[in-house]
Amino acid sequence: QLWSMENANSKESILSAQYSKDEGNTGNQMPAATSFHMARGWSDMYPELQFFKDFPEGARKEASFVTDIPNRGFSGGKIITKTPSSVEWSVSQRFHPMYGKWTKSEDLTVGPRTIGFRAQEVYRYSEVLLIYAEAKAASGSMDASALEALNQVKRRAAGLDPNTADASVDVTTATVNDIVTEKGWELAGENKRWFDLIRTETLEDAIAKRDPNEQVPLVR
């Protein structure tokens, strides 16, 4: 499990910010930022509904989102679990799933809000693979090495061996848009997608795809 505390500094990590509970620092705020108030977070960010629905099923989706929202309170100086212990996302406080990457390493013992001490990824190996594939596609030189880089990400996302070809997920062609879309799924909730949408001038396209049931208004 990539997002566990144990894998915070695995071979996947290229550059990351380190935290230590033993050193008494303030910790990683991403668990609170991506958790709803009812889960003892701040509801700062959560996935747009159509993005969640379009996200390919599989191991990566299961790791990226929380669909049963924890129902917690704060009593006696500690975070407690209420009854029921969780609520299905569509009837939850925010009517959305939560991002789940940072909740895998959350610490509920420090204070009234969930916090974490897992290293925060700035760049990781899968992003390097996708940057390479996109650069090759953008330069008109998409080749076997670029497709292999993309397919390694797609295989792992499906819970397969990333280094073994698999016709069920491998692609034989890919455009820049295909790769940027894959990057959006791979790095969901990691604060990268906005920059890719702006860079590729596809922000308006993403907005146009918003689910009509989306309850979060856009500020214009």
Residue ranges and their predicted role:
Residues 1-27, 59, 69-220:
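Acidic/polar-rich alpha-helix caps and helix-coil junctions
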Residues 34-52, 85-87:
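Short, cationic low-complexity segments
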Residues 61, 65:
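Catalytic and ligand-binding motifs that coordinate phosphates/metal ions
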